[in-house]
Amino acid sequence: MNLQIEMEHHRGVLIVRLSGELDHHTSDMVRMQMDEAIQRRQCEHIVLSLKNLQFMDSSGLGVILGRYKLINQKGGEMAVCDVNPPVHRLLDMSGLFKIMPIYDNEVNALTELEVVS
């Protein structure tokens, strides 16, 4: 399976929706596209929706942590939402939720980042 990336900008937030598999085959593409979007659009925050992400390995984890560090260095926040059980387990075991909040859906994430219209 491959990976689809959908990106949207909403009031200073880069919303990234991933579908498919985030692994060593697709992680570089995600990293490059997110970095370009962050630099080009001057995003303050990131919301990462994993609703349709079927699988993720340590390469995917690295992409998420790297984007977290990047946006954090700019004074922004990153949140994860819509995480399915297998991916949730990996993120939980990695300790990611100790540094990054998780929300049930995009609306809740945007509300917490105080950018809902």
From Swiss-Prot:
SUPFAM superfamilies: SpoIIaa-like. One of its GO terms (biological process) is sporulation resulting in formation of a cellular spore. The keyword Zinc-finger does not apply. GO terms for molecular function: anti-sigma factor antagonist activity; antisigma factor binding. Gene3D superfamilies: STAS domain (3.30.750.24). PANTHER family: ANTI-SIGMA FACTOR ANTAGONIST TM_1081-RELATED, ANTI-SIGMA FACTOR ANTAGONIST TM_1081-RELATED-RELATED. Residues 3-113 form the STAS domain. It holds the Pfam family STAS. The keyword Phosphoprotein applies. It comes from Paenibacillus polymyxa (Bacillus polymyxa). Phosphorylated by SpoIIAB on a serine residue. This is Anti-sigma F factor antagonist. In the phosphorylated form it could act as an anti-anti-sigma factor that counteracts SpoIIAB and thus releases sigma f from inhibition. Belongs to the anti-sigma-factor antagonist family. The modification Phosphoserine is found at S58. Keywords: Phosphoprotein, Sporulation.
